């Protein structure tokens, strides 16, 4: 099957939420981003492959980080949201075309991780320059540590149980603001917009600290949830 032969003619078949991932999508991704991304995916699936969409997603993400670093925060927010939408589009195109692949999943995951790293770093450095306060860097690195723990635990769960971590079902509260990259980037987008419009970087600084603290608590809770819900029937082994 070529890209142009992809089964996109039956538009009703691919209406929201057919292409969503209800177990692993966070609230924001499932209810907002997927509604928009499905519209793009149905129209692009006959014109590009999933890996090309991942490449476009990477461009949006890097552009967002550069804009934030150059102090264009509102434009950065726009690009962050485009990045979030196209983070859904690549996988949706793969499902529409019936061409899901391990390499595609690998590239998609790497793109998400790299872009979030760049964005948090760009926010921390840009905020430091605006406020002339090194605490912004400390808060940014604290958040990156929490992000590392959450993403590593998700990927290890997927490798151990051969399925995505069901954060939407098990972490409904954390899913609103920190358990997934989409919700974290939404919170950071709100922080960027509010701080840029008010001219007060203190809101964004405290948001970085709050997200960092929430991420560490989320990680500890996740350990308990995995132990509680998935330990049964697991043979004892090192």
Which ranges hold each PLM region?
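Cytosolic-side membrane-entry/anchor segment at the start of a transmembrane helix
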Residues: 9-43, 84-106
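Core segments of transmembrane alpha-helices
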Residues: 56-63, 112-123, 175-194
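Basic, amphipathic juxtamembrane/active-site segments
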Residues: 78, 82, 91-138
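Short, amphipathic, aromatic/basic-enriched membrane-interface segments that mark the entry/exit
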Residues: 40-53, 106-111, 169-178
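Membrane-embedded alpha-helical segments that form the functional core of polytopic membrane enzymes
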Residues: 52-103, 200-211
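Helix-coil boundary and interhelical linker segments in multi-pass alpha-helical membrane proteins
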Residues: 63-78, 118-142, 192-207
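C-terminal membrane-associated helical module and adjoining short loops/tails
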Residues: 1-36, 149, 153-238
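Hydrophobic alpha-helical transmembrane segments of multipass integral membrane proteins
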Residues: 58-65, 81, 85, 117-120, ...
């Amino acid at each position: 099957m070529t890209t142009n032969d992809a089964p996109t003619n039956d538009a009703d078949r691919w209406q929201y939420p057919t292409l969503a991932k209800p177990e692993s999508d966070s609230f924001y991704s499932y209810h907002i981003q997927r509604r928009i991304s499905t519209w793009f995916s149905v129209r692009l699936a006959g014109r590009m492959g999933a890996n090309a969409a991942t490449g476009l997603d990477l461009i949006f993400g890097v552009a967002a980080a550069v804009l934030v670093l150059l102090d264009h925060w509102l434009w950065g927010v726009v690009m962050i949201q485009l990045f979030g939408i196209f983070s859904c589009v690549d996988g949706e195109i793969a499902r529409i075309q019936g061409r899901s692949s391990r390499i595609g999943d690998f590239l998609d995951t790497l793109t998400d991780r790299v872009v979030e790293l760049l964005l948090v770093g760009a926010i921390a450095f840009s905020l430091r320059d605006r406020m002339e306060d090194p605490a912004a860097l400390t808060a940014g690195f604290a958040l990156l540590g929490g992000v590392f723990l959450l993403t590593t635990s998700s990927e290890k769960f997927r490798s151990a149980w051969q399925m995505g971590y069901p954060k939407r079902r098990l972490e409904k509260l954390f899913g609103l603001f920190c358990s997934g990259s989409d919700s974290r980037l939404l919170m950071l987008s709100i922080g960027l917009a509010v701080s840029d419009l008010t001219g007060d970087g203190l809101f964004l600084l405290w948001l970085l600290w709050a997200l960092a603290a929430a991420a560490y608590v989320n990680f500890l809770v996740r350990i308990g949830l995995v132990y509680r819900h998935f330990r049964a029937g697991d043979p004892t082994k090192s």
